[in-house]
Amino acid sequence: MSRPSRFEGRIGRTVAESEPYFDEGPHPDDAFGGRDSAANDSAPNDSAPNVVVVLLDDTGYAQFGCYGSDIDTPNIDALAAGGLQFTNFHATPLCSPTRASLLTGRSAHAVGMRAISNFRTGFPNMLGHISNDAATMAEVLSDDGYATFCVGKWHLARMEQCSAAGPFDQWPLGRGFDRFYGFLEGETDQFHPDLVCDNHHVEAPSPVRSDRSGHGGQDGSPVGGDGGYHLSEDLVDQALGMIADSVGVRPDRPFFTYLAFGATHAPHQAPEAYLEKYRGRYDEGWDVVRRRWFERQLALGVIPEGTELAPRNPGVEPWEDLPENQRRLAARLQEAFAAFLDHSDDQIGRLVEGLDRLGQLDNTVLCVLADNGASQEGGPYGVMHEMKFFNGILETPDEAIERIDDIGGPHSHTNYPWGWAQCGNSPFKWYKQNTHEGGVHVPMVISWPDGLDPAQRGTRRDQFVNVADIAPTLYELVGVEAPGTYRGIEQLPVTGNSFASVLQAADEPATNTLQYFEMGGSRALVAGEWKAVCKHTPGADYDAEAWELYHLAEDRSECDDLAEAQPDKLAELVALWWVEADRHGVLPLDDRTFELFGARFRDRSPHPVDRRYRYRPPMSPMPAQASAPIGGRSFTLTARVTRSAADGGVLFSTGTENSGIALFVQDGRLVLDYNAFDDHTVIESDVEVPARDAELVLRCTRGDGMSGSAELLIDGVPAGSAKLPLYLRVISSVGSSIGYGGGSAVSSRYQGAFPFSGTLHEVEIQLHGHAPGVDRATARAEMARQ
């Protein structure tokens, strides 16, 4: 007879002679004395804290108001004033590695995530996902009875596995979360995001919607800063809705919520009211503003007395030397970033208010942090549209200034220039992707009204802390242990160091005194008060590159290189770095980027070697990395349809209103809109599509340079053609839709999804050859999207 494996009752001949047993699984209150394993029906203890981790993207050390900037972040500032503010917190220099380390309590390399999750290399340090021998915080807490929710950016699964076809084992629900709402890739448009709910793709809600969280919208009125949709608002609505659902039915069950905003990663987009708020605020330029922020940091005590402001990074020009148009453009790009962060802070405020309204705030450990330093992907001038750069179009400030009023809104995809990124990383040098302090030294605030000594609220913590230390700290606070075996797999040891002791006393010693860093061949090691760091040039001999040495206790901003003065100390730290590299699975060092993206398509495509992609609707939208890679390649697209004279709509769409390709039937004609950054090449067939079965073909051919051509055919007969002045190598960060237009409309000739109203039997895309330079352009684009 089959019985539950843990049945501890008694079975007699009848129910009157038997004793039932209900195995409800572990409960987090077991650790607090409220329940024990032998008495699962005892009353729960309310002392198990909730856990909420809020992660911001590409936010530099100085950019919160409480860390020195003049950007309005009153809600984060209030959390710091009522909690603890960490001044020596470090992440990895990149998105996916930080997230992997945060969620596992282990080094990113050890769990297979040395870089972004877009590729795997065949080595254990780069799997494209978190290894299964490293249980996530969600898996550990879920097994201990917590409800677990993931909202926002994931970027911890291989991108080609993020379509509706799966596999789903490395999506959030496959790694311990009960619910997920957000996006799987490295970035998304804030007004027209690629969204996933649990394990399926969904369209963004209408700007007019009901709001379960209690923030406006109860009567169906518009929600948003200017009456429109914005992803950050939606994410907070969803997080609060999940929490309300859980605590309403199971008030005895604590929750873990991981809220990872798309903000403040490019594109920098905010509601119009926030953009207007910052008009003119940064006209003084980055030199004056950076100095002011630095002086405010000294006054606030978030950098040690005597810290120097690092010199300008190479490529950052003095503001006063810039031409007028370049200054105007750069100032407006910084305004958009500030508006984006301000708006994000308001959403964090809504989250805090919602937790309070639900009666959950006081017993919630709330952690707000950034994943790496401010972004360098905007280049020296900043960009109006990142994809232009990746297509070899170097837009000058004089050209970009013509669209200055689009910055920060739905018609732009902007990132700010190096000067503002270094300002955001004040007082440090370098940026995201670098192992100097500008790339890894980021803000973190922790609030826990019930758990922190009231005397400690509003105080700073200057001890060195690393992102891998967060998970073991939270485990200690909630009273759980990371398992030695999970789902039958022996687990890697948790190598992060709990800093729970530091939360209750400012003078407690640091628990992490030895920390390595590595990114793309750049290396660093912090050992107590000392740091050795090497900035790697791709392709250079690792052994020939010079290391720098800094005494962080006296030189937090890495201004005084002691490598020549103390060669023995430097040699000691460099040797120790190699020891730590071996211990944490860092090796082999690998500075490849574009080669890996090419290998993904050439060697591991799930499609046949002839590169034929066949889609049969209805289908969910496909993310860019799972779509047919038509950028920079000649291809033939064939749509087989059955239509009446009245039928029309989109057959195929990829990209957005900023750049993309759309093929559709309108007013009886087959239409191509090839949108190269708002320069539209439109071909309308010279004959109507027959009202019957028909084969509709788009043939795109890349030329020798940056141009190409396109031709339409109906049932094999040419029906129109045109030259394409710019043949897009990297089309968009947004993927493809079959039978309708996803996200923002690629073409201005239709609105919304414009679904095809006839019968679309299939869309077949045949790639022709491999275009040189595409892998490099794709790699640059993906590295910017991390």
Residue spans of the language-model regions?
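Formylglycine-dependent sulfatase
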Residues: 1-543, 547, 556-575, 589, ...
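Acidic glycine-/aspartate-rich tracts in secreted/extracellular proteins
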Residues: 108, 554, 768-772
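Non-catalytic alpha-helical coupling and interface elements of nucleotide-dependent molecular machines
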Residues: 156, 479, 582, 765-768
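Short beta-strand motif preference
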Residues: 257, 444-446, 525, 548-550, ...
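Asp-box/BNR beta-propeller loop motif
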Residues: 553-557, 716-717
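Charge-dense polyanion-binding interfaces
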Residues: 574-592
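Extracellular glycan-associated modules
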Residues: 588-786
